[in-house]
């Protein structure tokens, strides 16, 4: 029978239950259920042989839905944790949530009718806030788990839990007993919209803020001993000029600051003489549109203790010295209001100035502001002060000034600096110890160390009190008679015990007799409990104590903290401040920071632009699934591994499509490997290393190189290197090279042939190690591969199988250098084959005969050995025709005959030509052979396939049907 197709069922085609399509929306939850049902994470975290590894979770805020930044953060953490698990360490990951604070309180209040808010007691508000936070935690927890993130989701840490609150009060108490906590009347960032003090980490600086800046003169009324002989003649009309961007603070002005080391000039301005910094005379001439003439100069320190008249109030103020005064802007003299600025306050303390802060909690001028009382400082107050200065003849100029100005991060409204009674952590008391601790930490990227060092070096004392109800109370009482705070070891320990048992609601539920320890219930004094709560950064900054140090199986210091780069001024800082203050060391050994997620054009994501990427839609798809297809969690995880997280990272629809393409390539490669192992059992069929052909040993060398690189990528947290290496391995090394060549021996050989089993040996090694390598990132795909292995393994899950297993003997650089040359030749051959294919000279490369010339004699001998003319002495693998996927290869002694060919390439060292193959096409392997047609029994077969068919018939594996076709015998 000579009809084509009679042998097509005699080839070994791939078989696997591993789908080509991921169907992630259905399959990923099934795999997550498998992990949960078999407690894979729990067993490994308890029973792995290595030491304990704790990546301590920075708590997201329990408010609203998760955004793409949450996904980036949690997936990075999970990638590290899973790598450590595969390395054999006992990974203990406890996810956490930040549950107190103003944003949740505001959410609760927004959901209550205005008329009912007045009836809301602090306790009822707290109950509603707790309920809101817990519901949000539950919702966010499900989302995080859908990302494939492993951890102790059954028992996360919540800052509202009694045991956490008690540990936090313990940290506060230790700091207080060491003298690091004090109460002071100082300027703090104050949010009129929230009516509470804010920490620096609760501020944001939006683009586009414009202030009304003013240049103002104050009339000099008295000169210091040093200045008098120099300036006395100008005194009747001598004035100091100041510049400010906060006109509303002028009623709080008590001094004017100069830099002692700057030179100041007296300039003639019309009828007046003005004192300004000499370096700014030229700039001010232009700004104030006035021709200033320098009359005299003198050092700033000469003006100390001179006096001036406030232009709006019947009081004089001194000229004082401050190193912070510069010539970067303004006049070189700074209007100083100790109640409205940190540096102003410090100068005020130095010179014994009063603390004047004539503004109340909602940002309204008090009676101390005289005619401005009742005006809101940021609205009518600014305008009124400017008009009053104009009327007093003290206003030189007003202009708009665009600059960075602090806003409340939650209400998105401007804040002010306002002196109030607050509780502070005295950072000065332990600043040097914190700086020393920072130097012991491994910061990734390295510039993080400079960033946090600079912030801690320059920061002021930490205002830790808040005037809100939803938080952990500051455990202090005040003496009714004296107002003195009662805060000592006995009171803190007593309250800590109550909170541990009943939670912080007890502060509002219990009366003083229950909250005070025994001696203070009857000491002749009466006390009232404080109403302030702690800054939420103190909440989360105590997590090392409440979680790492308190939970038995964890570790303190933790191995790692990992958050966004904004946490250098947030959680990283509050954590190291509290840890160093109480225990003298950092709470972490390594700190890794990542950037923010931007769109593909590098813009911030915002609903108004419409460029927001919602992780839930990435995973499950949007309403329009053509527009927003369901990619599943692994594609999202793959994106996280692909970016250089050290800076801001882009994401959008095009990038997601690219990630999905890479995902599919890895999946299709894995599917090919699985499909061609369907009849392979490593225990019985694996070929020993010394018996492998050169090509297979070269691939094991490449596997060693590739997976060593992958290991180094994970160890150095450079996940983008993992992404590039694995993608390149799957596409370039496997699909385009090894697997392309392997198809012939996998499909055409007898099932148990050495050339096939040796290839399957390499496929199994590649597949198992690929599954392990991708498991930290493509967790679902890796598990899907492992569960689809067609042979038994001793490990229930890919994660239980440990990290990649590479044998020393596989490393063979000498062999690799030979095969690198062969691959380069193959590339050139492929280019000529492609040219012939494009111009329809050939269809498949098997229709071609390759003519090859090399100038190097040694290489020529090596190629001769790979090109047996009769098949004798060959292992039927390491042959040029298989390498090039051509039916024949002819080695030329000289390149001169190549010139006559239509399809050819020549260089100084290499010549390639392509012509049509000799003979006819074999119906089974599709190679061309002059043998086809010679056999009476099998005229359609080549001399390679004929004996294979005869052997398969003899072994009873195939038989001839009545229709004259060969088919496998069913067992």
UniProtKB/Swiss-Prot annotation:
Instruction: Name the CDD domains for this protein.
Output: Anticodon_Ia_Ile_BEm, IleRS_core
**Positions with a binding annotation for ATP:** 607
Q: What is its EC number?
A: 6.1.1.5
Keywords of the record: Aminoacyl-tRNA synthetase, ATP-binding, Cytoplasm, Ligase, Metal-binding, Nucleotide-binding, Protein biosynthesis, Zinc
One GO term describing the cellular component: cytoplasm
Major enzyme class: ligase
Residues the entry annotates as binding Zn(2+):
922, 925, 942, 945
The record's listing under InterPro entries reads: aa-tRNA-synth_I_CS, aa-tRNA-synth_Ia, Anticodon_Ile_BEm, Ile-tRNA-ligase, Ile-tRNA-ligase_type1, Ile-tRNA_ligase, M/V/L/I-tRNA-synth_anticd-bd, Rossmann-like_a/b/a_fold
Q: Where in the cell is it found?
A: Cytoplasm
Question: Can you state which reaction this protein catalyses?
Answer: tRNA(Ile) + L-isoleucine + ATP = L-isoleucyl-tRNA(Ile) + AMP + diphosphate
Required cofactor(s): Zn(2+)
Main localization (coarse): cytoplasm
Motif 'HIGH' region in this chain: where? 60-70
Per the record, the GO terms for biological process are: isoleucyl-tRNA aminoacylation
- The sequence motif named 'KMSKS' region is recorded at 604-608
One MF term in GO for this entry? Answer: isoleucine-tRNA ligase activity
Q: Enumerate the transmembrane spans.
A: none
Q: Which residues bind L-isoleucyl-5'-AMP?
A: 563
Cofactor annotation comment:
Binds 1 zinc ion per subunit.
Main role? Catalyzes the attachment of isoleucine to tRNA(Ile). As IleRS can inadvertently accommodate and process structurally similar amino acids such as valine, to avoid such errors it has two additional distinct tRNA(Ile)-dependent editing activities. One activity is designated as 'pretransfer' editing and involves the hydrolysis of activated Val-AMP. The other activity is designated 'posttransfer' editing and involves deacylation of mischarged Val-tRNA(Ile).
Subunit field text: Monomer.
Q: Which family does it belong to?
A: Belongs to the class-I aminoacyl-tRNA synthetase family. IleS type 1 subfamily.
The written remark on domains in the entry is:
IleRS has two distinct active sites: one for aminoacylation and one for editing. The misactivated valine is translocated from the active site to the editing site, which sterically excludes the correctly activated isoleucine. The single editing site contains two valyl binding pockets, one specific for each substrate (Val-AMP or Val-tRNA(Ile)).
* Name assigned to this protein: Isoleucine--tRNA ligase
- What species does this protein belong to? Acaryochloris marina (strain MBIC 11017)
Organismal lineage = Bacteria, Bacillati, Cyanobacteriota, Cyanophyceae, Acaryochloridales
